[in-house]
């Protein structure tokens, strides 16, 4: 595990080429007045993501409108689809009289070549099902059909409780570890390396520890970095996880 404190745009070039299997990051959306909430230079960020990711690596990036549209537009060629995280709470109460409250965040998935994809929650069928080609379907199968061995394939709506206010909430936009574990297990295998270049309080790192993945985390804010460092040291049982620091 590597934890780096400093500006990710300065530290990303230090990460070796083609060394990362997945980027999982909650980028700044640029929709609040928080001092850290400024959209990163996307052209430069994508150049670094392409460099550090393996050819079949995936980037799963949290977003919400209007940032979602800007994020997809920043790399339309490699954008593939979105997951939609349905929270157990709503936001936007101050504007409830003029617009609907929100309970969804987007997770935009990008890749160049087909990545690792491990559908979660599959149930093996007692008896395989053969599906013959259907000439009336707009989705034509190649060859003579297919055999279905599993059911309960995931759809794009993911329902996970958010992190409630209290001692377990370390960051204002903290994401739930079970959701991050789900994404890590979907796009990587045990022993793979996951990068979070805006790690906040380190939730992605916790997910990686619990699922047996390697983790590289970068955080600019020193206070949040120290929270993440302490949290990950406690989770892993190891001290001195810091690999470098940029003033």
Spans of model-derived segments:
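Core catalytic lobe of class I
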Residues: 1-218, 223-226
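S-adenosyl-L-methionine
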Residues: 1-12, 235-247
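Short functional hotspots where side chains directly engage DNA or cofactors
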Residues: 227, 231
């Amino acid at each position: 595990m590597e934890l780096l404190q400093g500006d990710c745009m300065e530290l990303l070039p230090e990460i070796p080429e083609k060394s990362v299997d997945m980027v999982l990051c909650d980028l700044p959306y640029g929709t609040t007045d928080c001092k850290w909430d400024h959209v990163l230079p996307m052209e430069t960020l994508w150049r670094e993501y392409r460099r550090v990711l393996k050819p079949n690596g995936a980037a799963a990036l949290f977003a919400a409108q209007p940032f979602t549209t800007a994020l997809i537009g920043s790399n339309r060629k490699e954008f593939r689809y979105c997951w939609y995280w349905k929270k157990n709470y709503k936001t936007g109460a101050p504007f409830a009289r003029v617009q609907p409250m929100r309970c969804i965040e987007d997770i935009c998935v990008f890749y160049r070549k087909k990545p690792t994809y491990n559908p979660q929650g599959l149930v093996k069928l007692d008896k395989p099902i053969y599906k013959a080609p259907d000439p009336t379907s707009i989705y034509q199968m190649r060859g003579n059909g297919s055999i279905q061995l599993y059911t309960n394939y995931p759809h794009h709506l993911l329902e996970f409780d958010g992190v409630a206010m209290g001692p377990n909430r370390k960051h204002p936009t903290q994401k739930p570890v079970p959701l991050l574990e789900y994404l890590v297990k979907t796009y990587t295998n045990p022993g793979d390396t996951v990068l979070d270049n805006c790690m906040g309080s380190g939730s992605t790192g916790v997910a990686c520890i619990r699922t047996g993945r390697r983790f590289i985390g970068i955080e600019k804010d020193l206070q949040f970095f120290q929270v993440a460092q302490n949290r990950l040291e406690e989770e892993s049982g190891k001290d001195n996880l810091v690999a470098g620091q940029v003033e």
